[in-house]
């Protein structure tokens, strides 16, 4: 099984597999500051039929959330992407001109970054094609393929969107962290609409109870908007914001629930579906705790609103998904190391006052990624540490039986020529 990815590849198994993998040309394409690489998924063929079925259903669930992230990253991202795709597929003019070639690169960058801003630096892309070319190209394609609002003309669509694409002063930064500026108003991300930073902070501060030892992650799964002068949340759930995509995700999760490996995993999937259907953040915490406790399933996954780096206020989470399965051979090696954690602690080159007398809550596994989606794709993370709530992490510390290493992705780094550079183990220990 070979899958296209941007930078990092899933971990492998025995030396024979690695040697075979090194014969593959991993480079797919290179443009702008990006290099697209493909990666292998060793070990998939060794899974049982039921396990493969589970991976398939979870993979389908992962594929349904793509447009959620595009919209989270910017209000006009989906409209711009669909305009570009309509021209890319339907333009009848000369596709070898510098303008069309530049538009093609721009579209690929939009695909890669899930929007019109750089996936890492968050600055807006500068198009290498002219507004005149793009207007003529948009007007030349079948209007039925364009993302026109009800009653909107092609010209009106261009007037609405062109400043976002071509004016460097409009939405220049997806996430602005400059001191002294209103971080909400100056960030192009789509987590707030019509509210200022102060209004957003006041809204959520009013919800928080300093005495609550198990607080929910306020704002994690919603857009904060001001409508008719009233500030309110639009929750991401079935029947709410992003409801259509989430309904499809739940559909595939329901199928996955039917082939779950263990009762614990079945409970995890059921609780995640409940969260998507209700949008209740207490339910999300219950899901996170169940997920942490499930250490025996070989197939594992993340699907949901997880990391908050895309929000300038660090509250609202982008959607992402990862489906993986345990690499048994590599995990055995890792467990040998983690099982001797106390020895490493005792012999670490730090002052004795900083050493722990007893290391607890150490476990580890090495995984192979079957698919990544949303904010994990195509620019991948090398690890996902969940849950984010500090109080849940503290529970794991107090109860060593529930202490786990939340290590989600082990990668082989690829060189531009496709050779395997290193085997990276990313571990987060609660100890």
For the regions a protein language model found, what residue spans apply to each?
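Sec-exported extracytoplasmic/periplasmic mature domains
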Residues: 49-52, 59-64, 85-89, 258-261, ...
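C-terminal motif of bacterial Sec signal peptides marking the signal peptidase cleavage site
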Residues: 6-10
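Conserved catalytic-core segments centered on acid/base and nucleophilic motifs
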Residues: 44-47, 54-55, 256-259, 428-431
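N-terminal-proximal low-complexity accessory segments that begin disordered
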Residues: 20-83
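Sec-dependent N-terminal signal peptides
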Residues: 1-5
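Contiguous, non-catalytic segments that form substrate-binding/exosite surfaces or channel walls
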Residues: 107, 111-428
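Bacterial signal peptide processing site
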Residues: 12-15
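Post-signal peptide N-terminal segment of secreted/secretory-pathway proteins
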Residues: 69-70, 75-108
């Amino acid at each position: 099984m070979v899958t296209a990815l941007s930078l990092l590849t899933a971990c492998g198994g025995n030396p024979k597999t690695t040697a075979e993998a090194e014969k593959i040309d991993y480079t797919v394409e290179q443009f702008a500051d990006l290099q697209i690489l493909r990666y292998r998924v060793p070990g998939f063929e060794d899974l049982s039929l039921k396990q493969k079925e589970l991976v398939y259903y979870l993979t389908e669930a992962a594929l349904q959330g793509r447009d959620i992230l595009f919209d989270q990253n910017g209000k006009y991202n989906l409209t711009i992407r669909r305009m570009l795709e309509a021209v890319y597929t339907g333009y009848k003019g000369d596709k070898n001109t510098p303008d069309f070639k530049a538009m093609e690169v721009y579209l690929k960058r939009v695909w890669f970054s899930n929007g019109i801003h750089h996936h890492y630096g968050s600055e807006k892309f500068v198009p290498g094609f002219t507004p005149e070319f793009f207007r003529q190209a948009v007007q030349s394609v079948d209007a039925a393929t364009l993302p026109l609002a009800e009653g909107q003309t092609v010209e009106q669509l261009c007037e609405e969107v062109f400043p976002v694409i071509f004016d460097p002063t409009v939405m220049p930064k997806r996430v602005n962290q400059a001191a002294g500026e209103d971080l909400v108003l100056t960030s192009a991300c789509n987590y707030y609409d019509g509210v200022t930073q102060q209004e957003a902070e006041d809204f959520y501060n009013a919800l928080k109870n300093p005495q609550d030892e198990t607080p929910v992650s306020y704002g994690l799964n919603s857009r904060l908007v001001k409508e008719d002068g009233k500030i309110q949340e639009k929750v991401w759930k079935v029947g709410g914001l992003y409801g259509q995509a989430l309904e499809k995700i739940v559909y595939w999760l329901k199928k996955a629930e039917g082939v779950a490996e263990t009762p614990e995993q079945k409970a995890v999937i059921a609780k995640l579906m409940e969260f998507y259907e209700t949008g209740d953040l207490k339910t999300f915490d219950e899901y996170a705790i169940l997920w942490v406790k499930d250490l025996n399933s070989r197939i594992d996954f993340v699907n949901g609103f997880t990391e908050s780096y895309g929000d300038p206020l660090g509250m609202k989470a982008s959607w992402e998904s990862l489906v993986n399965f345990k690499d048994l051979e590599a995990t055995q090696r890792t467990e040998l190391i983690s099982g001797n954690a106390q020895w490493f602690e005792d012999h670490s080159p730090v002052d004795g006052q900083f050493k722990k007398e007893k290391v607890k809550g150490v476990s580890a596994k090495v995984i192979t990624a079957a698919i990544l989606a949303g904010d994990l794709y195509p620019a991948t993370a090398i690890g996902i540490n969940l849950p984010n709530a500090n109080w849940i992490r503290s529970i794991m510390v107090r109860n060593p039986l529930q202490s786990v290493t939340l290590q989600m992705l082990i990668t082989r780094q690829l060189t531009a020529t496709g050779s395997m550079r290193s085997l990276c183990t990313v571990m987060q220990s609660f100890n």
